[in-house]
């Protein structure tokens, strides 16, 4: 009897351990094979059924193709798991009305990561967050390489795609495009909690009142290396504005670094309610570029950062055309853009750089200019550039991403040679500029491995510009 009991216990533990071990579950629009989710060939045809099998830490749900989901329950999963797209076609789409994809209102320690997914056409009339509403201090939510497009909220709570309160939200390499709110936060509304956004794109989002892309009540935002393009607020009420970012609450602390704000608009004709609007809290903007941002429905401007008298605002080493007189601390970089506060002085003029937004890359691009012209990487006359240069801003020369993967630059301090290695099949020419924009070197038809003697150049930072018949790239290097 004792032997039987012992064997029974061991067998039970084995079965339980197997039941709750890490597993991968598959779901598609119509399902396949036996529809038990055990493989792509046997994918579930129902998203909610597939979620039931996500029952232990590190489980993964793979989404195949386009799956339509009304509302899904994940709040009861008190562990870390991932919902991931199989490929670029993996999409979760909604059917609108009185539904929201995910709601995390209950007390939970959920840690969920969404990866390689598109969330589209969730048009909800619920109170905030068409794709996600989270109001739980124990929640950790991550979106990695996702796309939110054409989601909307028509209830007054705001957050066309996401409404987040408490907990921790991390967004990396994600695009928010054409999301809307009939109130605040066209893409994201942060009531509280910690929200970190890195290397992401906010394009053509809109809100009827505040925060065309993002609205912060008392959340703490850290935004780095991201682009805000063509976002808008459409209301003309007394507090409406902040086409890209609006901060309202005294408890909000925000950091914006290495970001680009380009061609965002507000409906109001008040310059103090432009691309960013801060009414309270503590907000710091550094190493960023503001350009072509307008007010009065794109007919007037510029209007980059408007602010009320409350809170603390810091604007440093950044390029802009107009910021409010209520900005407390202004350090543009010696000799660079001093005087734009309140419209005095000379605003940035980057006309010759021909800034454009590349829909494919989600980046603002510019063309190379003469040394006498201001550009995003060479602004001012003191060699202390702001914006792109000091920060590695989210700017690139035309088609730079393509070329940058095919070229390397090394400086050998012993031989005083610059070594350039590339695998570009087209003819390529190189130019070297000082930090002030003076051309000091020019070579045509360089070899796949080219040694360039730069012994005659002084120590300092230089810009290497490469050109093919159709493309440009730029790299910086140091001679020491």
Predicted segment positions?
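Bacterial Sec-dependent N-terminal signal peptides
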Residues: 1-23, 397, 451, 466, ...
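Beta-strand signatures of extracellular beta-sandwich domains
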Residues: 26, 62, 429-433
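Acidic Gly/Asp/Thr-rich repetitive segments characteristic of extracellular carbohydrate-active
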Residues: 30-62, 370-378, 412, 440
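N-terminal extracellular ligand-recognition/capping segment immediately after the signal peptide
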Residues: 58-81, 87-90
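Predominantly extracellular beta-rich ligand-binding scaffolds that present long acidic/polar faces
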Residues: 71-78, 113, 133-134, 140-145, ...
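Right-handed parallel beta-helix/beta-spiral solenoid domain characteristic of secreted/periplasmic
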Residues: 79-124, 350
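Surface beta-loop-beta hairpin patches that serve as ligand-binding interfaces in beta-rich domains
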Residues: 362-396
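C-terminal outer-membrane/trafficking sorting elements
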Residues: 400-480
């Amino acid at each position: 009897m004792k032997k039987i009991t012992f064997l029974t216990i061991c067998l039970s533990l084995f079965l339980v351990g197997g039941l709750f071990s890490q597993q991968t579950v598959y779901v598609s629009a119509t399902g396949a094979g036996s529809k038990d989710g055990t493989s792509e060939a046997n994918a579930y045809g129902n998203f909610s059924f597939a979620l039931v099998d996500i029952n232990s830490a590190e489980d993964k749900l793979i989404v195949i193709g386009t799956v339509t989901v009304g509302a899904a329950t994940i709040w009861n999963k008190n562990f870390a798991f991932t919902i991931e797209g199989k490929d670029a076609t993996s999409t979760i789409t909604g059917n609108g009305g009185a539904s929201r994809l995910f709601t995390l209102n209950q007390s939970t320690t959920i840690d969920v990561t969404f990866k390689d997914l598109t969330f589209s056409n969730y048009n909800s009339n619920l109170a905030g967050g068409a794709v996600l509403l989270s109001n739980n201090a124990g929640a950790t939510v991550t979106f990695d390489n996702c796309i939110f497009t054409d989601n909307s909220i028509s209830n007054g709570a705001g957050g066309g795609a996401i409404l987040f309160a408490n907990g921790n939200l991390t967004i990396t390499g994600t695009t928010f495009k054409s999301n809307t709110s009939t109130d605040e936060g066209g893409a994201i509304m942060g009531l509280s909690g910690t929200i970190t956004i890195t290397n992401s794109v906010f394009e053509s989002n809109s809100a009827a009142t505040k925060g065309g892309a993002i609205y912060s009540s008392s959340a703490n935002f850290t935004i780095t290396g991201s682009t805000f393009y063509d976002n808008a607020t459409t209301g003309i009420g007394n507090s409406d504005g902040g086409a890209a970012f609006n901060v309202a609450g005294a408890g909000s602390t925000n950091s914006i670094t290495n970001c680009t704000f380009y061609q965002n608009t507000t409906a109001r004709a008040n310059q103090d309610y432009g691309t960013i609007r801060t009414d309270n809290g503590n907000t710091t903007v550094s190493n960023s570029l503001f350009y072509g941002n307008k007010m009065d429905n794109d007919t007037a401007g510029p209007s980059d950062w408007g602010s009320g008298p409350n809170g603390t605002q810091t604007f440093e080493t950044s390029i802009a055309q107009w910021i409010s007189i209520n900005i407390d601390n202004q350090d543009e970089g010696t000799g660079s853009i001093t005087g734009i506060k309140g419209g005095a002085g000379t605003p940035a003029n980057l006309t010759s750089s021909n800034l454009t937004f590349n829909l494919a890359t989600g980046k603002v691009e510019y063309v190379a200019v003469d040394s006498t012209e201001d550009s995003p990487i060479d602004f001012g006359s003191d060699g202390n550039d702001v914006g792109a240069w000091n920060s590695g801003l989210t700017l690139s020369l035309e088609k730079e991403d393509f070329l940058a993967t095919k070229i390397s630059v090394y400086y050998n301090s012993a031989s005083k040679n610059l070594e350039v290695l590339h695998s570009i099949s087209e003819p390529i020419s190189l130019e070297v500029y000082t930090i002030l924009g003076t051309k000091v070197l020019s070579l045509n038809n360089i070899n796949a491995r080219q040694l360039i003697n730069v012994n005659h150049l002084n120590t300092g930072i230089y810009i290497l510009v490469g050109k093919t018949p159709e493309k440009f790239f730029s790299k910086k290097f140091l001679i020491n």
